[in-house]
């Protein structure tokens, strides 16, 4: 053999010997070095180089990301129990390859974990708790879930998450407690629920669990004991535009000094109600599933749709803003106490709620003809006031629609 061939065979034999003796390998990640892998796996650098001849003498060839390296030989004792802290090359890889049921090493530390996790969290003797990151989690959300440590604590224990918390990886475990961490939520209020957002008022004494479809205004109106500014001050994580409410999380709806009953000039006003409701209201109605303005008007027959929307402006002119289980004004001073006769259908918008007599428009009808039909018991001005949709010039009479031709009193 030539010297070159002899050297190559010897090198390959050494590599094969190392591979044969190796009892555990680890795939290197970007940024790994001989020193970092040796440190992570608690082995001597000289042993690491001996087990991995491809790195070259004194690690002159370096470590290649994606390549497997021996981190334990079969004569060096049992397999290391703590996984290394190298980062996966991309977040996508971490999300798609992380095990749905991570293994539990013999020392109690779960796998996988991210780079730099608190030393106290790597030992079953010191770690209080671990948490497996879920899709949609944020640092604040995790902190709020436990309520036993601060965001600063969390980032100190899990520096790989980053100061802006953009480095959380789904299906990886993060440290949520070291020796000395309280086992129950902290704060001045022992009754504070566990699922709260960051920054919630420390002196909160009343809580509300957010439901799907809730908004800050909706919650405020439901209680009617505090202002929107109060709510946002007590729950800053909701954001000024209230886009940060989390379903099934608790928000603060009362601190010392907050009224225990709805505020307002009328102690008989029910709750909840929407903003802008007339202060002259004398009677209320609780909206049911499937209600519309027209349906409410037709069932009570004492006011018009235009009157209803003027008393309850939050429903909108198109009446798309009715909320189930909220109260709406259905009477003010002067509203008839008793329903009029059953209103026929169809009728045009705005017909008076005081109508007690109707006429079905026929082909060829016009206003004067209808007035004469009733022996001039009313005039054009009255007919238009009872049926504003027909227009002042009476150009919008609809055949087969009913119009009002008589009112109460």
Swiss-Prot record:
Positions annotated with a glycan in the UniProt record: 58
Keywords: Cell wall, Chitin-binding, Glycoprotein, Repeat, Secreted, Signal, Virulence
Residues annotated as transmembrane: none
Positions with biased composition (Low complexity): 87-106
Compartment(s) where it occurs, according to its Swiss-Prot or TrEMBL record: Secreted; Secreted, Cell wall
Domain LysM as annotated: residue spans: 24-71, 129-176, 206-253, 283-330, 357-405
One annotated Gene Ontology cellular component of this protein: extracellular region
MF terms in GO: chitin binding
Region entry Disordered, spans: 74-111
Induction: Expressed during in vivo infection of insect hosts.
Alphabetized Pfam families for the sequence: LysM
Disruption phenotype: Lead to relative tolerance against H(2)O(2)-induced oxidative stress. Impaired fungal virulence in both injection and topical infection bioassays using the last instar larvae of the wax moth Galleria mellonella. Impairs fungal propagations and ability in suppressing immune responses in insects.
InterPro entries: LysM1-like, LysM_dom, LysM_dom_sf
Signal peptide: 1-20
UniProt domain comment: The LysM1 domain might affect the protein binding specificity whereas the LysM2 and LysM3 domains might determine the protein's chitin-binding affinity.
Family: Belongs to the secreted LysM effector family.
Additional detail: In plants, chitin acts as a microbe-associated molecular pattern (MAMP) that is recognized by lysin motif (LysM)-containing plant cell surface-localized pattern recognition receptors (PRRs) that activate a plethora of downstream immune responses.
Function: Secreted effector that enables the plant pathogenic fungus to manipulate host defenses for successful infection. Required for the full virulence to infect insect hosts. In contrast to Blys5, Blys2 is not able to protect fungal hyphae against the hydrolytic activity of chitinase but plays an important role in evasion of insect immunities. Binds chitin. Coats and protects the cell walls of insect pathogens from host cell recognition.
UniProt protein name: Secreted LysM effector Blys2
Gene expressing this chain: Blys2
